[in-house]
């Protein structure tokens, strides 16, 4: 049996719940956003969607441990566009493009050095092609292929200039079959395949090669229902360019 009282080296583990927690950094973030989107009918079978989001992202990170503080403000416009073609009433073919960005303070907004504070945010460009097919009144199928690429700024210590490099690249496919089995039971089966590549050509972290999912929803009556879902993921790597598997 597993013994949680000791670690892998056989040393007793303990947690002190009486000491005060010590923060390594504190972040102050202010975000102001404006989002606009419109869909227009070009013909009876063709629709176009245009939109965008304007963000003002202001962040200050205080490094309590080292006694430093860095700030940065990013004002960026992220466009998005889509084209929908309906060859028949129950089938839609679509293509979309969108951009998003992530400040250089990272996903948790907890690290901002003097170098990263002078760099532009990471920009993510995503394109997608897909189909949505209402096979019957109670059965639908969707499929898509997509590609997402990260562009990030880097600082050259020798020249003192910024430049852009290609970062994370992810492409893949997604499939889903959704059906109303009975008046009360709905099922959805999904599958996705992803491939992630780092800027150096290695394998990206936490990108599962295959994912299967099954979700069920049962409506007992108009006031009560339950749902159950199962997801199975294939192999993914612990960190970028690593051979270690989760």
Identify the residue ranges that each predicted region occupies:
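Outer-membrane beta-barrel translocator domains and adjoining extracellular loop/strand segments
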Residues: 1-3, 60-67, 105-114, 152-161, ...
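Short C-terminal domain-edge/linker segments immediately following a structured domain
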Residues: 7-20, 124-128, 172, 176, ...
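Glycine-rich, charged/polar anion/phosphate-binding loops
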Residues: 1, 127-129, 213
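Surface-exposed loop/turn segments flanking beta-strands in extracellular/periplasmic regions
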Residues: 1-22, 114-118, 156-164
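Structural signature of Gram-negative outer-membrane beta-barrels, strongest in the C-terminal barrel
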Residues: 25-150, 180-182, 190-195, 217-223
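Gram-negative outer-membrane beta-barrel transporters
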Residues: 43-44, 140, 145-149, 164-241
């Amino acid at each position: 049996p597993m013994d949680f009282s000791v670690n892998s080296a056989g040393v007793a583990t303990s947690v002190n719940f009486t000491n005060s927690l010590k923060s390594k950094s504190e972040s102050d973030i202010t975000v102001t956003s404006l989002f606009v989107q419109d869909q227009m009918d070009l013909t009876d079978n063709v629709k176009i969607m245009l939109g965008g989001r304007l963000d003002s992202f202001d962040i200050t990170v205080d490094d309590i441990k080292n006694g430093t503080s860095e700030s940065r403000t990013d004002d960026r416009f992220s466009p998005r566009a889509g084209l929908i073609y309906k060859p028949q009433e129950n089938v839609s073919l679509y293509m979309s493009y969108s951009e998003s960005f992530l400040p250089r303070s990272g996903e948790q907004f907890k690290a901002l050095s003097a170098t990263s504070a002078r760099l532009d945010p990471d920009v993510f460009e995503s394109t997608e092609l897909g189909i949505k097919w209402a096979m019957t009144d109670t059965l639908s199928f969707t499929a898509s292929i997509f590609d997402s690429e990260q562009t990030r700024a880097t600082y050259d210590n020798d020249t003192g200039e910024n430049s852009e490099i290609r970062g994370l690249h992810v492409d893949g496919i997604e499939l889903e079959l959704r059906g109303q089995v009975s008046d009360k039971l709905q099922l959805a089966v999904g599958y996705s395949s992803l491939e992630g590549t780092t800027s150096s050509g290695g394998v990206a972290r936490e990108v599962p090669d295959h994912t299967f999912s099954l979700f069920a929803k049962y409506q007992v009556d108009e006031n009560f229902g339950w749902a159950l879902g199962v997801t199975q993921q294939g192999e993914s790597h612990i960190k970028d360019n690593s051979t270690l598997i989760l």
